Amino acid sequence: MNFKNIYLIFFQFLKARYNFKKIRKKSIVIYNEDSSQLIADFLDSADYYILDTSLKYINFRILLKSFIKYNFKWKPKFYFYTFLSELSPSYIITMVDNDLKFWNIKKYIKNTETILIQNGWRDNLLDIFSELSPREYNSFNVDQMFLFCKKYEDLYKKYIIGKTHTIGSMRSNKFEYSKNTINEVIFISTVKNTNEESIQIKPVQTVFPLLCKIFKEKKIKFKVLGRTLPIDPSEEKFYRNMSNDFTFINKSKEAHKCYKYIDECRLVISIDSTLGYESLSRGNRTAFFTIRGEDLENKSTNFGWPNKLDDLGPFWTNIYNEDYIEKIIDYLL
């Protein structure tokens, strides 16, 4: 553990709110608050526990117990494993499918069944698979994995021993498709932080001014669906610095509204967002300008990865070419 990581952990523990509650056993644990409500909607409210993995709230009694148990080998993950042991659940479920700590739970807690539900489109550039190597094939264990597609089944099974199932997106599946087409185009923002490295924002800076120009000329209303929650004014400002020829829609805490926005528009445009792939699966006309990996020679951000598809397709391009982008838009409109 390097000095930077030690500092970050120390700072997290300093900010945390502590309690001394005695933990009662639960038959089901939802690992990580992210998307926990989606899982909780299917469960008896009295029968599950949501484990906070952000270290915002720390049970001091569990923390002390983990220090005693693991002493000089202690790492933050051992706090979570000790907490899970105390809860002694029959099932541990997560929608944070790219958390290595979850992949490792079975090494520390034997008498429980782990269930992983894929929550987002993955790559090996900025996501979980960039942290793994062939040496880690079959190094992890998750009992049941519910994934977007067959190709993801093949990918996860390289590293994780367990059963896989294709279900698409659980979140998208929950909300009914209701098409009421309006003559508008919506762009799905992938910008979380305008101070991010250029690898995050460069594709948007490259393609967005062109899109504004195209739809202004076509006299079609162009909208941007924001990404940040809580709402960050700098996200809209980032787009306004490139053009004013669009309407900005802040992301809603109500998940169903995102699907309403994409379902009602004539055309949805995405760089490489999960919502873009969900839009396609819902039968919406969806264009993908997956140009993030072009300069980096990284294929995992290409359209449809881990499938191996051509760089140019009827509704996608992995290469920035203004004429081809306009051709895709004309085809889909």
Region spans (language model):
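A short, charged/proline- and glycine-enriched loop
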Residues: 18-29, 87, 177-185
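Active-site and donor-binding regions of nucleotide-sugar-utilizing enzymes
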Residues: 6-18, 28-172, 276
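Short, charged, surface-exposed secondary-structure boundary motifs
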Residues: 58-64, 124-130, 173-179, 257-260, ...
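Catalytic donor nucleotide-activated moiety binding site of glycosyltransferases and closely related
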Residues: 53-65, 187-188, 212-254, 298-305
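Conserved acidic residues
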Residues: 89-90, 143, 183, 263-267
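Donor nucleotide-activated moiety binding/catalytic core segment of transferases
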Residues: 76-78, 227-282, 286
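Catalytic binding pocket for nucleotide-activated donors in carbohydrate/polymer assembly enzymes
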Residues: 166, 239-243, 274-333
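Conserved catalytic-core segment of nucleotide-activated headgroup transferases in glycan assembly
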Residues: 39-42, 46, 170-240
